[in-house]
Each structure stands twice: as C-alpha cells, then as structure tokens.
UniProtKB/Swiss-Prot annotation:
It comes from Cuscuta reflexa (Southern Asian dodder). It comes from the Eukaryota. The keyword Ribosomal protein does not apply. It is found in: Plastid membrane. F-type ATPases have 2 components, CF(1) - the catalytic core - and CF(0) - the membrane proton channel. CF(1) has five subunits: alpha(3), beta(3), gamma(1), delta(1), epsilon(1). CF(0) has four main subunits: a, b, b' and c. GO terms for molecular function: proton transmembrane transporter activity. GO terms for cellular component: plastid membrane; proton-transporting ATP synthase complex. It is a multi-pass membrane protein. GO terms for biological process: proton motive force-driven ATP synthesis. Pfam families: ATP-synt_A (PF00119). This is ATP synthase subunit a, plastid. The gene is atpI.
Length: 247
C-alpha cells in the first residue's frame, strides 16, 4: 500500500505541474480545458520550420549532396549513432522517435534566442520558446516514459515487470519510484535550464543593453543544444535499459 500510495502521489505531482505558472499566459478555451495558447503558437512555428527545412533539403536528392541535404544527412547519422550507442543493435525502429525529440527540443531552444518573439504582441503574456513552459517539458518526459515502458513490454511481455524485484524484492519500492521519478528529472532539467537562460538574458539586456548580453546569448545557444542532446540521449538510454533489462 505504501508503494502504491507513493506512486499515486508521484503521478499526481506530475499532473499538478500543469498548473505551474511563471509569468502571465495567453489562454485558449478548448472544450472544458484552458491551454496556454502561446505555447501552441510557438510549437506550431517550430514544427513548420522543421517540416519546411526537411522538405526543401530532401525533396530533390542529389548524388553530390547540396549544403542542405548534406546537413540533414549529417544530423540523421548523428541521431543514428546516439540511438545505436544507447539502445544497441535493435535501435532502428527508435531512430524516428529519438530524432524527433532531439530536433524539436533543439529548434525550440534555439528559437527562444534567435527568433524575435517579442515583436508579436499578445493580449496577455508573451511568446517564448516552447520548452520555456513546464507543460511542454512534462509532455515530452511522459512520452519518453510511455516509450520505454512500451519498449520493455513489447520485448519481454509481462515478464518486463519482474525487473522490479531484482536483484532482491527488498528493492521493489525503490525500483518503482525510479521509473516514476525519471520523467520528473527529465522535465525539470530541460525546463529549468531554458527558463534560467532566458531570464539571465532578459536581466542583462535591461541592465547593460549594449555588449555584455551577447556572449551570454552565445553561451545560451551552446547550452540549448547540449540540453537537447542530453534529453534525447537519456531517452534512448532508458529505452535501451528497458529492452536489455539493465537496472
């Protein structure tokens, strides 16, 4: 009962995160739900950038690759290497998922620093990187959790759950809590880093608007890319762990 109670509290904590707010928000009413409209707008922009770039780069493949085709081939090779390293020989079906996570987070993070979101005025709140909202990072983390549970169950069936009593049943509560805390760490790490980066830039621009914020912005671009790599690498590692049965 204690384990079940802790698990329920952890899930409730993840649900309650959707109510966390930093600053003002532009709400849309969809049925009985209120959603953060500015997050949907910026997410659609990021998706449009990714789809548009991919379409332009690979719509007419060349034997001698163009710059765009070469870039996308390099990114694909990089994602395949990350997936193979973390998941193993059965990495193939998971490349699209890991690649989608990496590219969406990478472009979302960079959009917060490079796109002039502040030009567009909203009735309430302001536009920012999608990953600057806790709802986005929690959603990505929960997708990752669903993916590694699916990977483990599809590979081992119900025998997958035997890992919770290995190497000894005494560790059952710890093993269960470990799986429920993974999405917490993934979501808070990404959200905290992106929010902190944007807040630092805003504060420096307000204090010293000329030169000082520029190095910080370049550092933010670097850390934004690193955060995308960390998230996708951990997602691949969790999937590989569930398929191999490593604890």
């Amino acid at each position: 009962m204690d384990v079940l109670s802790c698990s329920i509290k952890t899930l409730k904590g993840l649900y309650d995160l959707s109510g966390v707010e930093v600053g003002q928000h532009f709400y849309w009413q969809i049925g009985d739900f209120l959603v953060h409209g500015q997050v949907l707008i910026t997410s659609w922009v990021v998706i449009a950038i990714l789809l548009g770039s991919a379409t332009v780069a690979v719509r007419n493949p060349q034997t001698i690759p163009t710059v765009g085709q070469n870039l996308f081939e390099y990114v694909l090779e990089f994602i395949r290497d990350v997936s193979k390293t973390q998941i193993g020989e059965e990495y193939g079906p998971w490349v699209p998922f890991i690649g989608t996570l990496f590219l969406f987070i990478f472009v979302s993070n960079w959009s917060g620093a490079l796109l002039p979101w502040k030009i567009l005025q909203l009735p309430h709140g302001e536009l920012a990187a999608p990953t600057n909202d806790i709802n986005t990072t929690v959603a990505l983390a929960l997708l990752t959790s669903a993916a590694y549970f699916y990977a483990g169950i599809s590979k081992k069936g119900l025998g997958y759950f035997s890992k919770y009593i290995k190497p000894t049943p005494i560790l059952l509560p710890i093993n269960i809590l470990e799986d429920f805390t993974k999405p917490l760490s993934l979501s808070f790490r990404l959200f905290g880093n992106i929010l902190a980066d944007e807040l630092v830039v805003v504060v420096l621009v307000s204090l010293v608007p000329s030169v000082v914020p520029i190095p910080v912005m370049f550092l933010g671009l670097f850390t934004s890319g690193i955060q995308a790599l960390i998230f996708s690498t951990l997602a691949a590692a969790y999937i590989g762990e569930s398929m191999e049965g490593h604890l």
